[in-house]
Each structure stands twice: as C-alpha cells, then as structure tokens.
C-alpha cells in the first residue's frame, strides 16, 4: 500500500516577504518539496520571488507547475490535469509537498 505525503498550501501574503506568516515560513523550511505556479513553462514565478526576497534559498528540487493565463477552457483543463497528475505522482513518493501561493 502506498503511503502518500501531505500536500500543504503556503499562502505568502500580498507580496511583501515580511508578511509571510510564521507557520508558512516554518513549512518552507520543513524539508517538504516545493511546488510553485508559473504562467508559462520556465518563466519566473511571483510566488517563488516572494520567498527569494525573504532570504530563503530555493531548494534544487523545487518544481514549477504551469497554470496558463487564458480563458480557453480546453487549455485550462489540460493544464490543471497535468498539474494534478504530477502532484499526485510526487505525493505517491511519500514526501510532503508545499504549494506556494500568493495572497
């Protein structure tokens, strides 16, 4: 039987790294693998930049998930499906994941 890791959401506040909660800061340093959103593959992530400006090093295994900025339902559905499949695959490895989100 597979033992899944936990998926943890880390809200990073409105963009000022000084406003990241203590709990989110602790989760970011817990050893959980980081997932972060981008609009396009290999593009910068606003959520990731908040953490960087806060002074935390970005783990080498941090991974982007692409969430395109479009109203095309087919494109969105495919992107969300890819992100979900990847997230479940990583959780199935048994390691906790933290998903970085602004707001």
Which residues are covered by each model-predicted region?
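Class I S-adenosyl-L-methionine
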Residues: 1-17, 22-103
């Amino acid at each position: 039987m597979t033992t899944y890791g936990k998926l943890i959401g880390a809200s990073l506040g409105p963009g000022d790294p000084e406003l990241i909660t203590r709990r989110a800061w602790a989760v970011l340093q817990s050893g959980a693998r980081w997932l972060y959103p981008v609009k396009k593959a290999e593009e910068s992530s606003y959520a990731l930049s908040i953490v960087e400006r806060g002074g935390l090093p970005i783990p080498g295994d941090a991974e982007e998930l692409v969430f395109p900025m479009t109203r095309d339902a087919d494109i969105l559905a495919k992107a969300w499906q890819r992100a979900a499949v990847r997230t479940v695959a990583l959780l199935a490895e048994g390691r906790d994941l933290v998903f970085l989100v602004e707001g």
